[in-house]
Amino acid sequence: MSSAGVVEMQKAASFRREGGGSMASMWLSADGNGAFSRSSSSSSRRMRGEEDDEEALRWAALQKLPTYDRVRAAILPMVEGEGGEAGGGGGGRRVVVDVHSLGPHERRALLERLVRVADDDNERFLLKLKERISRVGIDMPTIEVRFEHLEVEAEVRVGNSGIPTVLNSITNKIEEAANALGILPTRKQTLRILHDISGIIKPKRMTLLLGPPGSGKTTFLLALAGRLKDLKFSGQVTYNGHQMEDFVPQRTAAYISQHDLHIGEMTVRETLSFSARCQGVGSRFDMLTELTRREKAANIKPDADVDAFMKASAMEGQESNLITDYILKILGLEICADTMVGDDMVRGISGGQRKRVTTGEMLVGPANAFFMDEISTGLDSSTTFQIVKSLRQTIHILGGTAVISLLQPAPETYDLFDDIILLSDGHIVYQGPRENVLEFFELMGFKCPERKGVADFLQEVTSRKDQKQYWAQHDKPYRYVPIKEFASAFQSFHTGRSIANELATPFDKSKSHPAALTTSRYGVSAMELLKANIDRELLLIKRNSFVYIFRTIQLMTVSAMAMTVFFRTKMHRDSVADGVIFMGALFFAVMMIMLNGLSELPLTIFKLPVFFKQRDLLFFPAWTYTIPSWILKSPMSFIEVGGFCFMSYYVIGFDPNVGRFFKQYLLMLAVSQMAAALFRFVGGAARNLIVANVFGSFMLLIFMVLGGFILARDKVNKWWIWGYWISPMMYAQNAVSVNEFLGHSWDKVLNNSLSNETLGVQALMSRGIFPEAKWYWIGFGALLGFIMLFNILFTLALTYLKPDGKSQPSISEEELKEKQANINGNVLDVDTMASSNNLAIVGSTGTGSEIADNSQPTQRGMVLPFTPLSLTFEDIKYSVDMPQEMKAHGIVEDRLELLKGVSGCFRPGVLTALMGVSGAGKTTLMDVLAGRKTGGYIEGNISISGYPKKQETFARVSGYCEQNDIHSPQVTVSESLLFSAWLRLPKDVDSNTRKMFIEEVMELVELKPLRDALVGLPGVNGLSIEQRKRLTIAVELVANPSIIFMDEPTSGLDARAAAIVMRTVRNTVNTGRTVVCTIHQPSIDIFEAFDELFLMKRGGEEIYVGPLGHHSSELIKYFEGIQGVSKITDGYNPATWMLEVTTVSQEQALDVDFCDIYRKSELFQRNKALIQELSTPPPGSSELYFPTQYSQSFLIQCLACLWKQHLSYWRNPPYNAIRLFFTTVIALIFGTIFWDLGGKMGQSQDLFNAMGSMYAAVLFIGVLNGQSVQPVVSVERTVFYRERAAGMYSALPYAFGQVAIEFPYTLVQSVIYSIIVYSMIGFQWTVAKFFWYLFFMFFTLLYFTFYGMMAVGLTPSYHVASIVSSAFYAIWNLFTGFVISRPATPVWWRWYCWICPVAWTLYGLIVSQYGDIVTPMDDGIPVNVFVENYFDFKHSWLGFVAVVIVAFTMLFAFLFGFAIMKLNFQKR
């Protein structure tokens, strides 16, 4: 299992060599025998059989090598046709090879000989390994894990204070500060996750951990793995009697998380190889050395292939090794080994394959104990069975320890385990041998029905909702048996007593194998880890080359624009004012290179989840990660900055001196490196993209404002002068300005000058820049210091900070009451009982899956009537254009047919399962019938109760429950349902009836206790997967549809959750609706809850359409009637059997076509007749007709969308609270930096300073708004696609709601900013001027926000929108009128000033404050005249400017609406 739990093929244990002590002493125990010895003398066994003389000589030569060389050399057959390379096919002459340098071909050939088919050969191979180790008396290290009196608690907010509204986020932060100071008592409640549990996990035994969601399984596994840091923890966990402090638990045991965090740009093989390289080989090398020494002494010749395998897998420092290949094979990942893992942006492997990569990542290491959390999610039952079987072989043969949590283990998988731990609400209800578990529950009065999987029974029997159906003591009345009662009864049960007795005797530490527990912190040397990270970083730079190429092109483009704006023929050196324009060009260059570093933020943050996972698993220390990310990206700066400087230096007309050119290039390189380091640090410290964007912009803004150009040094107030001295941009601006203005072309004294200073020095002094030449090197040195500082801070942040946490844990009062009632057996109040007792039939009669049914008569019709409708379809064909990849492989057809003439019918009150293997076309057929396809070619007839289907009307009477459970994250369950009902129920349904109907639906789907729970984002916060599934169903049900399609409603759920969802589905059918579900791999009782089956085979053809029958009898009878089909065995799942006997390989083996057999059957004729019958409209019926496309008017749609957006925004503090907080802080900082500068108008520099305050605020707060709105709109757009397809509303009301909700938040933001800044900077206090200032700020922030929304609307994803919009921000910045005024802009670019929205904002702000002031400045020119001459800003234009600003706002909002209406980036 070495190499990964699944392998540790030598489980020599994870004991590492530590410095000091000889090899011999390391493996000697106290009595003088070797650490791996089992007896004092090793047996001496001779080689058997005759050997080829040549090979015998080769082996003899190998044995004579020194130990170090001997463990690196193996004898392998030569590869035919490979020029003598070894490692190939089975036969041929054998040669001695160095195992450290085996190539992929040789490794593959060796594995083929050892484990050709994982299913058949793995056990044989492991037994060979074990036999080799055992025969020289070496013992495998084992670990026994004990946990005693384990208690874990968390602090949670209960009720409304836990809902993250803008107000709550502020009050909770204040409350936490007051708690910390001891001013206020905390309102949080303590929630116990684990309740005083004790037990033993034995080695060489497989332990299955079961329990419903929220029972504490993940917390328990984390506690066993020594990974609980953030929760209150008491009790102890020991390994072989040793406390956690005595060894390194993260490396001794491997915790495999249920979250699949991987770098999408790496292939599966690269991901596992990197993991293996970091984790090292544990004690495999040391054990191998001892093994070969003993074999040599005993003159034993091992199996050559096994010897080669063990040697190759004991070598450290290989970029890819044999263990990786072995794990890929046994996890069934060979087929996708060289495919990218993928993520949201990169297409990659499937969810099930990704789950296996997560498992394999830890199996390639040398850990001896494995704690695996839900490793089967997304896998089909046969793959899960195969993986668990391989793990079982490794654990049993090589002596590992494993606790594995599974969601819905099939009976055959369940039977692979030796022990069971059943956890419920933090109590251990049972722990011990699998054989005794049913005996315990029978003693408690509960019996598992015949056709019920034991694992499913165990997960349901402790639940209040499900327990009653299993009550077996019919002579006694049933009463609810609470969890506490089960737990205490288990203590008295014989298994519980034996565990208690064993725990009473402490583990004898002297029996612990010296190599069992790992004491070194990392698997390999620091230099090896650094090398591994360097190789990975180089790979990722290559794979992400698009980002760097795009960044370079973007910088070049801006450089090209800059050099044509500051064109040398227009750049003069006749006055200080000319110098200011040159300085503007230099400022713009420095700022663009700073902004170019901003792309490090998302690149850093997207990799952090994987980094934190690997750091916490002790793959490597943070510095081995941060150094490569700094050093290896430096060459990019040379190219990007080189392009910028080489293009622009001469064309702009900077000082024509080659030395000064290279000094400018050197300085810009330092700026580029400093910016990248700064933003990496911000990303590492913030760990969240929204927060990082805010603080990255914030730091950039502060550095820029205090950088010496926007506000001259002599104007910086004394309380902010420290900020000037620590701003990297100050040093950059000083150095680059000194380099230019002390050059020869500025070395002249003006005739009209009052001083003898050169023009260059005067220009420098006019902006408060130090005019001495030494300031170039001071600036350069300071930038190098900042580069070092930010990289060190980045390393420290990644070393000590925790991963970005989930939001504050909260729980509703109803959930808390229900939890306590389940534990203690308290009676629940009426509201909570309403949902707990809403039980209905799940299975067909006699299966034991019945549940007392108290609700049929009253719920049959429900409050709102509906018309039952049937759906028939005949000869449905669906094809798409042939993919280019397939054409490249020689396929000549123009179209690829996915459905081939499928026919069938779905009827009211009949629950139909749509099944088939992956690629059979289940979801495709459902999408075609529901009208959800956005492309492709559809042929055939679809009728609704005999009338041709029209999509506009069909959407009104149908519901579609998608597999992905897409909902707005910031609304509650009841609000989601109200929104759906409001927009989809007919106009004539009044609000009271609507509310009653919603209550009925919530009761039907058991959502009442969760009515006030926030939906949240999947896998991040809010509802669990199973609760989201039920919400998806409820959202469709409140539309009162007649026909409902459900795509995989039980995938990713545990057995109990799947039963709850199926009960919901069954309840829905019992109301008389037509329901069709695609289903993946159902358990027996879920499968038999269906009435009919529509079975498809790969290629899109039906092979069985008809009733299931009692205990699936009709289905079994049909397939067993086909000659050659193997009979089903007793108790076997009919669904699994049916899929197994209808595979393509079975068709080929039997030489039949199941589709042909079905089309020639009597069943097909019956179905044809039924389709004919249902395709004729019943007498007296009429075709579906609705006077309008949507059930509600345009106005109601707008109001409903606005209502939902209001709730979403109010409960989104990371977006709204942070932008309001940021705006307030920026306003206070600006107010203090530009304190009282608004009233100073003596010099032109005073006006530039005031304009600088406006420019910086507008640009940065505006860009912040534009950036931070994008992820919000992107999440809501995916919900919009689902809701529009469901016929809830048209695109414009959605766009209206999204646009309108921004008005109040932006107004508050503008008012906060304007009041603070206006008063502190000291602009003229007149009502008109203040309101003009507020007006321009408000509409500017609004158009920036709408521009960000528009960018999302026009692009397929948030990431692309972010890149596109940032390119335009750079161009806007150039043409604002601040860096270079409009009159100074070359005529060929002046047109852009008129279409740049920020230029109009600055026009409005300047002219409204200064355009009417006639007071003369020190040089006698009136202020308004200077403003008009220098900027070309006319006060008479103020009204027109205001209209233009409003027009830009409306334009961006309109374009957002247009994009949402016309563009659909969802492809189906």
UniProtKB/Swiss-Prot annotation:
SUPFAM superfamilies: P-loop containing nucleoside triphosphate hydrolases. Its main location: membrane. PROSITE patterns: ABC_TRANSPORTER_2. It holds the Pfam family PDR_assoc. InterPro entries: AAA+_ATPase, ABC2_TM, ABC_trans_N, ABC_transporter-like_ATP-bd, ABCG_dom, ABCG_PDR_1, ABCG_PDR_2, P-loop_NTPase. ATP 1 binds at residues 211-218. The keyword Disulfide bond does not apply. Keywords: ATP-binding, Membrane, Nucleotide-binding, Repeat, Transmembrane, Transmembrane helix, Transport. It is a multi-pass membrane protein. GO terms for cellular component: membrane. One of its GO terms (molecular function) is ABC-type transporter activity. Residues 33-53 are annotated as: Disordered. Residues 178-450, 871-1123 form the ABC transporter domain. The chain crosses the membrane at residues 546-566, 575-595, 634-654, 666-686, 690-710, 778-798, 1217-1237, 1247-1267, 1303-1323, 1330-1350, 1360-1380, 1387-1407, 1440-1460. Residues 528-741, 1196-1410 form the ABC transmembrane type-2 domain. It is found in: Membrane. ATP 2 binds at residues 916-923. The keyword RNA-binding does not apply. Belongs to the ABC transporter superfamily. ABCG family. PDR (TC 3.A.1.205) subfamily. May be a general defense protein. This is ABC transporter G family member 34. It comes from Oryza sativa subsp. japonica.
